[in-house]
Amino acid sequence: VLELAENQTSLLTSAYFDQTYNSQPTYIAKKGYSMGMMYGYMYEGTYKYEDFYKSGDTYVLRPGVPYFSSENNTQPGMPKYKDLNGDGIIDTNDRTMIGRGLPIHTGGFTNDFEYKGFDLSIFFQWSYGNDVLNANRLFFENVNNSRNLNQYATYADRWTPENPTSNIPVAKNSSSNKVVSSRVIEDGSFLRLKTLTLGY
């Protein structure tokens, strides 16, 4: 991005794939960076028991452990995000670039082989250095009471009291579970065999 509107250094854009996320910026255009930069929170796993002390039957976050601003009652197993500005509160000021939509490099190559009347033609194609926002994981590795959806098999490994080291959030409908974060950003690089032709 070389230039935006006058006195503008960045532009936020939402991805309109679901009403839960319509109001959240998912992409950012920023001067000096490539287009298609993904925007959200840096995921740090789930809150573990050691992040809390117990007061009776209640889990209370230890001093210095940041909490999500719109959560009234942070509990073990809930999503944990990086407090980028260090104020102890996870809020919109802690969102940042979390993925790169455009590849650093793309290409392909083809080659032909002949042997005793046989001929073989191959074409490989690649993309390197780009990320993918896997929005499916926002819905199929995530409990949201407004939907009745089957979940991915990986969701069986979510945080539970019997599985307290998991970094897949607990089955709980919470505001911290409804944000775009680096948890769903995946490496989009690939090398694929696009065509293969064998003749005689």
Regions found by a protein language model. Give the residues of each.
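Conserved small-residue
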Residues: 1-99
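Low-complexity, intrinsically disordered short peptide segments enriched in small/polar/basic residues
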Residues: 25, 57, 111, 165-167
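Flexible glycine/proline-enriched surface loops and loop-helix/loop-strand junctions
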Residues: 103-104, 181
